Regions:
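Fe-S-dependent hydro-lyases/dehydratases of central metabolism
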Residues: 1-767
Length: 767
């Protein structure tokens, strides 16, 4: 795999020309014409689709209107509640509500099914589409029923990726979907486009997860595709089936790219024909000369079976490399865990080595990444006639949709898997986010799913539990299962893959999915459960601000799972204040109490009482601020909005992973006004902060001018935002002294600044 250090021209879809002094002459000799870099940049597939959806008239500053929206049951309640509070009357474009996360209805009594009934009644009232539990995971339904060539889909899940079908899809936090529901736009600068040039053919036994992990391992740490579009081109694309391409595509999220798009061919056309939607196919190819801001060149022949060890999809090795350096790599994983868990629990992977081989406790093939038809058929072929054994090792398989499940029943794959001792379950995202198949304490699970962040498999550090997940392809998981849990690459087994043809039966959805066909019925009464709560009132940004640092995180990356846990906690997402009680609970259990304590001062301000009396700790802080800023009238007579109080956290690089808006909104409802970071892991997390009225501060790497529990004073912060200042002066209160330092605000649109000034997106739309 080669990552180019410069931009690259793709000529006639098959030749790469590096952007150097000889590039223009080389291109002219091949095409007979002169091209400019700016002109060639318009030759990417991504540029054409973005142009078709941009309503700003300026291709540097995009205002995108999407064709369709999709959400699942741990995001759609909050989104619709926000939209309702902002004036929603009907869904202006198709909006699909799937119920693939809290499908088991096993936590919190009625609250999960209450959310589902809320979704069904909203689909009826506002004109949406409702997919009941166990019918399909969000992204498989979108592939089967929503994707279309040249279109764009916005989803409230980070793995919203349908590029292999010719659809540019973006995963964002809920507020961005709210904007689309209110017929507003998705505003971004024109993203860079990085080409992924594929040649060769994947070797037998190598699956899409292997290709994806190989890419993630190369690009993540370098930030090579961060917030850019990945465009898959080259002859190697046609050497993969569409199901295979989908398996690679969905994992591009773990590179931190913004979106993805692939060139399309007759195989994609056949996919649409199989699904009864041949009219949605569109041939997509780059222009004769297309310019890319970067290029990843991959010979598919060279990719070997991969494994992403705990606790990140980028912690990748070939299985061959892992087996050759087993104890060293396991030791490294244990040391990383000690840092990540702050010594609260001890991960013991080396005890999994038996007779020089790594033993695995659990295998899972599931969800939008693993639950595809071909993944499961190939796994069944590898396992045919085998037994997974009567010991600790278990294997669970989750087809990504009921149509896939039914076809697997018809062709015998389900029977083959069940005969081995595997359990075949319904379409459910649980194993991907800690709501199903949580392993035993200190167990090691291998999964064809999307992520392996700390505790994402469901373990609870605060209760002394730890388990771990490695990501692998379904084929190597099956090979491991055939060896009763001893880690095995699929290339090490002798198998003939049957490659049965897929037949899609739309009758299942016709019988169970509610489709309003875009017709709203205002007479339908929305069904609310007792856990579904409105968003609490949120104040506008004050003129001046006192912030307490209530958590300080120095991990290289902080995931959204650490900011607000997934798993059973997700059941409470319909209740903003109830969910907030779990914020940072697995990373910093003292965060919630500290945030709520300083929030008392802000509540006192809003009630017209004295903040210092509410939080006695503030007395010397305010004395120091008054002494340093005597011109500021911070006395008992100060008018509302003059001074605000709240909390902030520091993290090196927060926001990797999920699109969940709750990673930000939970901080907000606990009184959070800001984050301070060296950088933000993803555009979507920074957008979530802004949409919830939180300041996304950045500070250079190095020694911090403050520490946890310090108070910070931000004079004239409202004026700084109004005047579009990119840098502000802040002060840390040290005893009776104030020490000055600087914070960056980064680029923001006028609308984003106005959202922060208003206090949140809801206030912004309420006017």
């Amino acid at each position: 795999m080669k990552l180019y250090d410069s931009g690259v021209y793709l000529v006639n879809g098959t030749e790469l020309v590096a952007d150097d002094a000889q590039a223009a002459a080389a291109i002219k000799s091949r095409t007979g014409r002169e091209v400019t870099k700016a002109g060639a940049a318009q030759g990417t597939i991504a540029y054409g689709i973005l142009k078709d959806h941009n309503v700003s008239g300026n291709m540097d500053k995009l205002q995108i209107k999407f064709d369709k929206l999709t959400s699942h049951d741990i995001t759609f309640v909050g989104i619709i509640q926000t939209a309702r509070a902002s004036g929603l009357e009907k869904f202006p474009i198709p909006y699909v509500l799937t119920n693939c996360h809290n499908s088991l209805c096993a936590v919190g009594g009625t609250i999960n099914e209450d959310d589902h009934m809320f979704g069904l009644t909203c689909a009826k009232r506002y004109g949406g589409i409702y997919v009941p539990p166990h019918q399909a995971v969000i992204h498989q339904f979108a592939r089967e029923m929503l994707a279309a060539g040249g279109k764009m889909i916005l989803g409230s899940d980070s793995h919203t990726r349908y590029g292999a079908l010719g659809t540019m899809a973006v995963g964002e936090g809920g507020p961005e979907l709210v904007k689309q529901l209110l017929s507003k736009t998705y505003d971004i600068d024109m993203p860079g486009v990085v080409g992924v040039y594929l040649t060769g053919t994947p070797r037998k036994g190598v699956g899409p997860q292997d290709i994806a992990l190989a890419i993630i391992g190369e690009v993540f740490e370098r930030g090579y595709v961060k917030n850019k579009v990945m465009e898959f081109v080259g002859p190697g694309v046609s050497n993969m089936s569409v199901d295979y391409r989908i398996g690679v595509d969905v994992m591009t999220t773990e590179t931190t790219c913004l979106s993805s798009i692939w060139r399309t061919d007759d195989a994609v056309k056949e996919f649409y024909e199989i699904h009864g939607r041949e009219g949605d196919y569109k041939e997509l190819n780059p222009a004769a000369v297309a310019y890319y801001d970067g290029m990843i060149e991959i010979n598919l022949d060279e990719i070997k079976p991969m494994i992403a060890m705990p606790f990140h999809p980028s912690n990748t090795y070939t299985i061959e490399e892992l087996n050759a350096n087993l104890m060293d790599i396991l030791d490294d994983c244990e040391k990383r865990a000690e840092v990540s868990f702050d010594g609260a629990v001890k991960l013991d992977l080396k005890s999994k080595v038996r007779n020089g081989r790594l033993y695995v406790d659990q295998g899972i093939i599931a969800g939008c990444a693993g639950g595809g038809f071909e993944n499961i058929c190939d796994a069944a072929d590898i396992l045919k006639g085998a037994s997974i054994g009567p010991d600790e090792f278990t294997l669970s398989v989750y087809p990504a949709s009921t149509p896939i499940y039914m076809e697997l029943v018809k062709n015998g794959a389900v029977a083959t898997l069940m005969e081995t001792g595997a359990i075949v379950k319904t379409a459910f995202c649980g194993p991907c986010f800690g709501a199903g198949d949580t392993p035993a304490n200190n167990a090691f699970s291998i999964r064809h799913s999307t992520r392996n962040f700390p505790n994402r498999e469901g373990s609870k550090v605060q209760k002394g539990q730890v388990a771990s997940v490695a990501l692998m392809d379904a084929r190597s998981i099956a090979a491991t299962a055939a060896n009763k849990g001893y880690l095995t690459a699929a290339t090490d087994v002798d198998v003939d893959f049957s490659k049965p043809k897929y037949h899609f039966d739309s009758a299942i959805y016709a019988n169970r999915v509610f489709d309003s066909k875009g017709v709203a019925d205002p007479s339908v009464e929305i069904q609310f459960g007792p856990n579904i709560k409105d968003w609490p009132a949120m104040s506008a940004l004050p003129e001046n601000m006192v912030l307490k640092v209530v958590s300080e995180i120095h991990d290289p990356v902080t995931t959204t799972d650490e900011l607000i846990p997934s798993g059973e906690t997700s059941s409470f997402r319909s209740n903003p204040l109830g969910l907030a009680e779990f914020a940072l609970s697995r990373k910093d259990p003292q965060y919630v109490g500290r945030a709520k304590e300083i929030q008392k001062a802000q509540k006192a301000v809003e009630e017209g009482t004295c903040p210092v009396e509410a939080v006695e700790e503030l007395r010397p802080v305010m004395d120091a601020i008054r002494a340093a800023f005597p011109e500021k009238t911070f006395g008992e007579e100060m008018k509302p909005g003059t001074l605000g109080f709240g909390s902030t956290i520091f993290a090196v690089k927060p926001g990797d992973g999920s699109a969940r808006e709750q990673a930000a909104s939970c901080q907000k409802v606990l009184g959070g006004w800001a984050n301070i970071a060296n950088e933000y892991a993803t555009k979507r997390y920074r957008s979530n902060l802004i949409n919830w009225g939180m300041l996304p501060f950045v500070i250079p790497e190095g020694a911090l001018p403050f520490q946890n529990l310090d108070y910070l004073f931000l004079p004239d912060i409202r004026k700084a935002v109004e005047e579009k200042q990119s840098e502000i002066i802040a002060y840390v209160v040290k005893g009776s002294e104030l020490k000055e330092f600087k914070l960056g605000l980064g680029a923001m649109t006028d609308d984003e600044r106005e959202i922060i000034l208003k206090g949140c997106l809801i206030n912004y739309y309420r006017g």
